[in-house]
């Protein structure tokens, strides 16, 4: 099982992943960005604005996740924004072909809530603000593609993690 936490930059995916891991025995956080960091020095001569645009990134994310799940026997929690529909489908298809069940969670909120959260954190503020428009453009299909949409606007990080844990079959008491 892989729980994929999607949403715009600054929506709380990483915090949710860490809280969810604490709630779910036999789970671990897998950060797909580490695959991008591995590719960066190897594809330095192939400039892209985001490593998700490198064609090898997507199948390597799926393969890495599948191998980690197979090796550890644990559920994976992946906090990763993916705003390109074809990219997400490519990754999820690879995960499913490797035998993993995918549960796609979208952490969502209105623009004013997201901007307030982003302004409240110095970490990557400009990057996060610059990508809000991309999230808004993808929001409709993301909502349709998600197994669970969580409005983070009025929930604490613990409440978000609890809601996810209860909604994912086989993870929580729900």
At which residue positions do the language-model features occur?
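Conserved phosphate-donor/acceptor-positioning beta-strand/loop module used by diverse small-molecule
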Residues: 96-118, 150
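Conserved substrate/cofactor phosphate-moiety recognition/catalytic segment
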Residues: 15-63
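Conserved glycine(s) of the Walker
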Residues: 12
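Hydrophobic anchor at the beta1->P-loop junction of P-loop NTPases
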Residues: 5
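Glycine-rich phosphate-binding loop used to anchor ATP phosphates in small-molecule kinases
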Residues: 53-103
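Short, amphipathic alpha-helical "lid/cap" segments that border enzyme active or binding sites
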Residues: 58, 62, 157-168
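The conserved Walker
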Residues: 9
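Small-molecule kinase domains that catalyze NTP-dependent phosphoryl transfer to phosphate-bearing small molecules
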Residues: 116, 120-163, 174
